[in-house]
Design a protein with these regions (language model features):
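Short loop/turn motifs at secondary-structure junctions and domain boundaries
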Residues: 30-35
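Conserved beta-strand in the GNAT
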Residues: 41, 47-55, 60-67
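A generic "binding-loop/recognition-motif" signal
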Residues: 11, 59, 102-103
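Conserved acetyl-CoA-binding loop-helix of GNAT-fold acetyltransferases
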Residues: 68, 74-87, 99
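Short amphipathic alpha-helix that is part of the acyltransferase structural core
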Residues: 1-28, 41-43, 138-141, 146-147
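Conserved GNAT acetyl-CoA-binding A-motif
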Residues: 89-102
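Conserved active-site alpha-helix within GNAT-family acetyltransferase domains
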Residues: 101-129
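C-terminal "cap" of GNAT-fold acetyltransferases
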Residues: 120-147
Length: 147
């Protein structure tokens, strides 16, 4: 097997099936709603193992999607994809990367902090599964010192 190759994905829609099969809520035309600005994928021998997408919403840069195929979870792919998204945000002068996380502990291990600002959870609060099968937390990675 070849090593895992991480590369920017220009066609964000190519990641839809991975996101959907990973249990993420993603609808048709998601790119028109989320306004993705950066997507990164992890591939090995041409096979898609994982991906992440950063979007611009609510005047913020948001890690909207991160998914890794079940058989390769635990190998550091999700961590690497997150780090590459953070590098992208730093590279364009961003000061923070926001997310609504179903697995907040994963992101906290990477130094994300919980926030009380629930702008990203607004849609979640209207979902019938909120608080039952799904209870995401809003988190933020601060990339520059905040006052």
């Amino acid at each position: 097997m070849d090593k895992i190759v991480y590369a920017e994905e220009k066609e964000h829609e190519n990641l839809t099936e991975l996101y959907r099969t990973s249990g993420l809520e993603i609808g048709e035309g998601w790119t028109e709603v989320c306004h993705p600005v950066f997507s990164i994928s992890a591939r090995q021998d041409g096979m898609l193992l994982g991906a992440a997408t950063v979007s611009r919403r609510f005047r913020r840069l948001v890690l909207d999607y991160l998914a890794v195929e079940i058989p390769v979870r635990g190998l550091g792919i999700g961590k690497k994809l997150t780090e590459l998204c953070l590098d992208y945000v730093r590279g364009i002068g961003g000061s923070a990367l926001w997310l609504a996380a179903r697995e907040p502990e994963f992101y906290k291990r990477l130094h994300a902090r919980e926030t009380e600002d629930a702008a990203l959870l607004a849609d979640c609060l209207r979902c019938p599964d909120y608080g039952k099968d799904c209870a995401p937390k809003e988190l933020v990675f601060y990339l520059k010192e905040t006052s």
